[in-house]
């Protein structure tokens, strides 16, 4: 490529970055930072721990967004200077350096651009993620546990705080179900593309004959309920049951009935929570999960009404959306976006960004197609 080609690429990247800065509203982010820093410095902040955690989490996120934009702007300016030097000195080595920096910038700006696609009503919310073992017996339960670790590792890689509300262990190995939250703004908009049925193909470590086994697990991503949602549930619409928390193999891990199960009588929705130390804490966590499920149900009903369709409760789990194949070859493939990789071990260790970004772009394309239909 010529100097002029690189100059044109940098011009395009500059325009894209300016658009990102405009959509994300850098001035608003700075104002949010000042407001949150003031709240974080209040002497009585930690009198309300939930509020304190929310403020510190939001401040960390806003600082991260501002720093990412500043870093991209700085790198872009440096690349322009580097290109000018390469042109002035006619130095092929410097031009090679420009090529590498332009390629890296294009990738980083492309990743940042994905954030501008999160404009749904609840996209800015924290996320509540539920994982449930499907068909496949003990392999499905093991797969559910693998998915839980995958998402927690993804959050850890990004420095996102998480809280596991519930883990229901299967008798032999793995999990029947698990529920956790990702406590950072836009977690719902980001992770909601992970909702659906996940499929694992491998040689079963639980089969004495070493046969290949296909198993399934469902992932459901919900927006965390906020006070403005006004999701009030009358006491007479709920049935509360308490029991002892259980660990792997069905072993009791508590000597008191601290685990809580709530059944919402009108809808039949059941939620459980057993990871907190006290029954009161588990009840509060279970109520938050129930509120999130009812909010999602309300959202689906409103969407169905707009589309003139009938709500399908099972549809919240979505169709089969990703396959993880460990035998006879190694591949993870998203069936909607065609995004794939030959390194499933890395994916299970939380390297999900490429799949999530492709999913967000795919969803936006689907929305635009529906709007134009």
From Swiss-Prot:
PROSITE patterns: RF_PROK_I. Methylated by PrmC. Methylation increases the termination efficiency of RF2. The modification N5-methylglutamine is found at residue 251. Keywords: Cytoplasm, Methylation, Protein biosynthesis. It is found in: Cytoplasm. It holds the Pfam family RF-1. GO terms for molecular function: translation release factor activity, codon specific. GO terms for cellular component: cytoplasm. It comes from the Bacteria. SUPFAM superfamilies: Release factor. InterPro entries: PCRF, Pep_chain_release_fac_I, Pep_chain_release_fac_I_sf, PrfB. Belongs to the prokaryotic/mitochondrial release factor family. Peptide chain release factor 2 directs the termination of translation in response to the peptide chain termination codons UGA and UAA. This is Peptide chain release factor 2. The lineage of its organism: Bacteria, Bacillati, Actinomycetota, Actinomycetes, Micromonosporales. The gene is prfB.
């Amino acid at each position: 490529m010529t100097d002029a080609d690189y100059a044109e690429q940098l011009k395009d990247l500059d325009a894209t970055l300016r658009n990102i800065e405009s959509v994300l509203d850098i001035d608003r982010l700075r104002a949010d930072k000042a407001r949150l820093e003031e709240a974080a410095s209040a002497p009585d902040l930690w009198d309300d721990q939930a509020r304190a955690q929310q403020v510190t989490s939001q401040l960390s996120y806003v600082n991260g967004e501002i720093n990412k934009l500043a870093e991209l702007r700085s790198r872009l300016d440096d690349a322009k200077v580097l290109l000018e030097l390469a042109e002035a000195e006619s130095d092929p080595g410097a031009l090679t350096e420009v090529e590498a920096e332009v390629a890296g910038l294009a990738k980083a700006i492309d990743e940042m651009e994905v954030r501008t696609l999160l404009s749904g009503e609840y996209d800015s919310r924290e996320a509540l993620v539920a994982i449930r073992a499907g068909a496949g017996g003990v392999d499905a339960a093991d797969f559910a546990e693998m998915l839980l670790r995958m998402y927690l590792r993804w959050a850890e890689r990004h420095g996102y705080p998480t809280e596991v509300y519930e883990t229901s262990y299967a008798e032999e190995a793995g999990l029947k179900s698990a529920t956790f939250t990702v406590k950072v703004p836009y977690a719902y908009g980001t992770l909601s593309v992970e909702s659906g049925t996940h499929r694992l193909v491998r040689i079963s470590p639980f089969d004495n004959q070493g046969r290949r086994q296909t198993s399934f697990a469902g992932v459901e991503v919900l927006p965390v309920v906020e006070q403005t949602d006004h999701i009030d549930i009358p006491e007479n619409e709920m049935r509360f049951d308490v029991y002892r928390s259980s660990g792997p193999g069905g072993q009791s891990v508590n000597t008191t009935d601290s685990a809580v199960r709530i059944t919402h009588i009108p809808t039949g929705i059941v939620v459980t929570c057993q990871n907190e130390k006290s029954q009161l804490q588990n009840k509060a966590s279970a109520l938050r999960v129930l509120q999130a499920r009812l909010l999602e149900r309300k959202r689906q009903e409103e969407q169905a009404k707009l589309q003139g369709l009938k709500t399908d409760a099972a549809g919240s789990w979505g169709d089969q959306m990703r396959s993880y194949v460990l035998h006879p070859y190694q591949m993870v493939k998203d069936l909607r976006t065609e995004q794939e990789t030959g390194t499933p071990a890395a994916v299970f260790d939380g390297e999900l960004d490429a799949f999530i970004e492709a999913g967000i772009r795919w969803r936006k394309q689907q929305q635009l197609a529906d709007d134009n239909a």
